[in-house]
């Protein structure tokens, strides 16, 4: 098959969404399919076209950033050409151009599969709320014209008023999770380097944005320390998020607890990410809203249980595996109690890597998409 994949950001950009798209695209390419990715040239130093791990990447110049997206003047012409050349189209939303893609595909008799990565939930500022309203409208139009909509979990979809409008099109395919085995000797050395020998380590990872709820974790720090003074919190991720300066609102808490809260920055190397998970005794996911953060399953595969808020989508890995605790969302007291429980009773929450890998198998995910695409060609 010739498969066209459309999304705003692709390799070497790294978020959960781009990791999803890259793992799936490269997996399909390994099986002999011709996969082309149409995406933004968000850095001018990136080549306009290249082949990476068997996937052809076509990058379009951008003229400006708009909230979380970018404006690509050359998109209509490029999409028009590439859609005609391919058998089926996959669009990862949100992306401004999604209704244009579905309209062009309809013109040429090509089917579109839209992969939904969560309802768009923006901060309460007026401009952000306008973007949320506008982009959700674009998504609604695109989803109405699509052949199928892939979702991460039924749990999230059943609680989403937006997705309930398209229940007859929904197909659940668990996300493609892939993480190398941790390196015990390097993990041990890293712990020593960071001064973490003999202490409890609470990890948290991802973009420091409002939806991730890391402000509640910072509020929970003194509550955890009251019961377990020998605890440190270690963050891996990006705090300088261009479209949402949320960290600045809570920097004072990080600085207040700077001896207990270590900031590692963004980790781009997947082996280093695996070692980070193994460095931690528990991973905290205090999200306000989250469709399905793959970091949770990656952490479990590296032997680290999680404490996550009991919200649609996010709660699924803990419910399926038992490898962690669910706590009330937006409640630092509940979060602290969950973290203390897992730290004190960690052995009760451990599960064999093989059990986690059977539930979240990369090849099974690729199988699901391969069958879906073939059914539409």
What is the role of each PLM region?
Residues 320-321, 325-332, 341-346:
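Conserved acidic donor-binding segment of nucleotide-sugar-dependent glycosyltransferases
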Residues 43, 177, 205, 232-248, ...:
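Glycosyltransferase donor-sugar binding loop
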Residues 305-308:
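Short hydrophobic beta-strand element within catalytic cores of glycosyltransferases
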Residues 83, 143, 275-280:
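Short alpha-helical donor nucleotide-sugar binding micro-motif in glycosyltransferases
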Residues 94, 288:
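Aromatic "clamp/platform" in nucleotide-sugar-dependent glycosyltransferases that forms part
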Residues 246-267:
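Nucleotide-activated donor-binding/catalytic signature segment of Leloir-type glycosyltransferases, i.e.
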Residues 36, 132, 136-184, 196-197:
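Donor nucleotide-sugar binding/catalytic pocket of nucleotide-sugar-dependent glycosyltransferases
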């Amino acid at each position: 098959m010739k498969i066209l994949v459309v999304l705003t950001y692709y390799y070497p950009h790294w978020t959960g969404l781009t990791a999803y798209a890259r793992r799936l695209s490269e997996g399909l390419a390994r099986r002999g399919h011709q996969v082309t990715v149409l995406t933004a040239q968000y850095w001018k130093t990136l080549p306009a076209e290249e082949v990476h791990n068997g996937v052809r990447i076509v990058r379009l110049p951008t003229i400006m950033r708009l909230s979380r997206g970018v404006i690509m003047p050359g998109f209509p012409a490029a999409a028009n050409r590439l859609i005609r050349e391919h058998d089926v189209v996959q669009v990862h939303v949100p992306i401004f151009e999604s209704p244009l893609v579905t309209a062009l595909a309809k013109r040429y008799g090509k089917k579109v599969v839209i992969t939904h990565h969560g309802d768009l939930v923006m901060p309460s500022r007026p401009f952000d709320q306008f973007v949320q309203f506008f982009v959700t409208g674009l998504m609604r139009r695109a989803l109405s014209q699509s052949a199928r909509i892939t979702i991460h979990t039924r749990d999230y979809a059943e609680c989403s008023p937006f997705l309930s409008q398209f229940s007859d099109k929904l197909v659940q395919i668990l996300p493609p999770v892939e993480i190398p085995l941790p390196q015990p000797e390097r993990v041990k050395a890293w712990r020593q380097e960071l001064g973490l020998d003999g202490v409890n380590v609470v990890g948290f990872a991802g973009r420091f944005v409002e939806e991730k709820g890391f402000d509640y974790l910072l509020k929970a720090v003194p509550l955890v320390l009251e019961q377990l003074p020998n605890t440190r919190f270690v963050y891996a991720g990006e705090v300088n998020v261009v479209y949402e300066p949320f960290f600045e609102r809570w920097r004072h808490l990080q600085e207040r607890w700077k001896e207990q809260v270590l900031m590692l920055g963004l980790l781009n190397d997947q082996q280093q990410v695996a070692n980070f998970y193994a460095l931690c005794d528990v991973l905290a996911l205090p999200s306000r809203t989250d469709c399905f953060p793959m970091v949770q399953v990656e952490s479990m595969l590296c032997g680290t249980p999680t404490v996550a808020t009991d919200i649609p989508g996010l709660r699924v890995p803990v419910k399926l595996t038992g490898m962690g605790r669910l706590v009330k969302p937006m409640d630092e007291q509940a979060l602290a109690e969950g973290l203390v429980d897992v730290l004190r009773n960690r052995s009760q929450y451990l599960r064999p890597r093989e059990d986690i890998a059977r539930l979240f198998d990369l090849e099974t995910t690729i199988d699901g998409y391969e069958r879906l695409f073939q059914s539409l060609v």
